[in-house]
């Protein structure tokens, strides 16, 4: 007799749930599926779930079949994610005190000046970071915990704040009633509404820094007409649901008056940004935008994410998978989480380092010989830009990509796939 661990039993429960969902969809008449798809599309359009391209809005397509997650699985994901996020929040202080850290997560000189000018003891006490950690996991596997792998952090201007909760609500309101027509006993509910989690974090942060007001600014390239359109629907949600004053601003629309940051006639108490600091520097240097209001918000710890958000380099994972660094800066419990769930990642360069097997070795030699298990990525790019998947390339092409990455003025990372 084989005795399963609780985690294995939970994974098999996830498999059973997934099987019931599949069976329910197989049992639906084709016309019912077509009806659901049409309604999802109409509801998504009504909720401004759009992606803008060159001034034209495309409604985002929602996949109908939900992914089922057991409560204990969700709790474990939260535990691991918060452990990693809290470690990442400490990187600005590590950067300021350790030159080795600066080599792994380098800032440009103007970015570093922003850090020195705006990072204060207040940030060490309460450090607001809104992040998304990109990961893969197989909930239906008996070994589902071991399948959880974090690929990279996104700690500034993350997408999905409006789209995620809206999508879950549509699945609950449109799809699940149809599923229960086939399987009445199958009960599923949406996860916690991220919009509510976020606004509570904002209000808690205002209280922690002693700021009495609750006027919030969402700051993004307001007039770009490119990408997702989330901040205005999100602002409208908070106005209607919570009665909060929430404004939607472009950086050029902020000013300082009487020692306060203002948008039109509204005093700003806290701001959420969809800009990296290097983008703000570009606005100042290339377009002449006055970014002093934003610098003030950073300095007074009234910007979400703090400067910690600008350390969401893919090379962060080297800090968390290098034994020398983790022994120096992180607890045994944190190190265990990192070893189990974070993909081995290194800044690509000609050096010796700890390899995935735990032994020191020549990095470039290892990368050249093991392309079938590795991925190359620009360190600070996003959106799948120039990601090279080793097993999808031949050896000659892989070697060319390595040479080009080493010659690039911007750092690249290599990661175990």
Residue ranges and their predicted role:
Residues 1-417:
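Preference for protein termini
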């Amino acid at each position: 007799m084989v005795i399963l661990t609780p985690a294995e039993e939970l994974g098999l429960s996830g498999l059973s749930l997934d099987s019931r969902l599949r069976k329910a969809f197989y049992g639906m008449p084709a016309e019912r599926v077509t009806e659901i798809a049409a309604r999802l599309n109409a509801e998504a359009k009504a909720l401004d779930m759009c992606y803008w391209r060159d001034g034209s809005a495309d409604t985002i397509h929602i996949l109908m079949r939900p992914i089922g997650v057991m409560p204990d699985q969700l709790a474990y994901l939260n535990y691991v994610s918060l452990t990693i996020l809290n470690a990442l929040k400490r990187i600005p202080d590590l950067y300021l005190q350790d030159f080795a850290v600066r080599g792994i997560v380098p800032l440009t000189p103007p970015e570093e000046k922003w850090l020195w000018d705006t990072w204060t003891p207040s940030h060490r006490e309460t450090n607001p970071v809104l992040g998304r950690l990109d990961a893969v996991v197989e909930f239906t596997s008996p070994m589902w915990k071991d399948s959880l792998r974090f690929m990279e952090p996104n700690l500034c201007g993350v997408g999905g704040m409006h789209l995620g909760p809206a999508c879950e609500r549509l699945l609950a309101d449109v799809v699940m009633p149809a599923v229960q027509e086939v399987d009445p006993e199958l009960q599923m509910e949406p996860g916690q509404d991220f919009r509510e989690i976020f606004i509570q974090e904002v209000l808690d942060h205002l209280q922690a820094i002693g700021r009495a007001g609750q006027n919030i600014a969402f700051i993004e390239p307001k007039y770009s007409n490119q990408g997702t359109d989330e901040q205005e629907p999100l602002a409208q949600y908070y106005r209607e649901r919570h009665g909060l004053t929430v404004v939607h601003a472009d950086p050029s629309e902020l000013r300082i008056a009487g020692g306060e940051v203002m948008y039109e006639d509204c005093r700003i108490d806290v701001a959420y940004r969809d800009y990296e600091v290097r983008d703000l520097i570009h606005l100042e240097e290339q377009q002449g935008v006055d970014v002093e209001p934003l610098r003030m918000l950073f300095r007074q710890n009234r910007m979400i994410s703090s400067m910690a958000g600008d350390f969401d380099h893919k090379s962060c994972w080297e800090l968390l998978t290098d034994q020398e660094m983790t022994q120096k800066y992180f607890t045994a419990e944190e190190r265990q989480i990192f070893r189990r769930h974070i993909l081995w990642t290194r800044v690509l360069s000609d050096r010796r380092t700890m390899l995935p097997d735990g032994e020191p070795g020549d990095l470039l030699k290892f990368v050249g010989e093991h392309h079938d298990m590795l991925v190359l990525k620009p360190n600070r790019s996003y959106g799948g830009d120039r990601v090279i998947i080793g097993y999808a390339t031949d050896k000659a092409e892989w070697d060319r990509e390595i040479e080009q990455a080493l010659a690039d003025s911007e750092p690249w990372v290599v990661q175990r796939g």
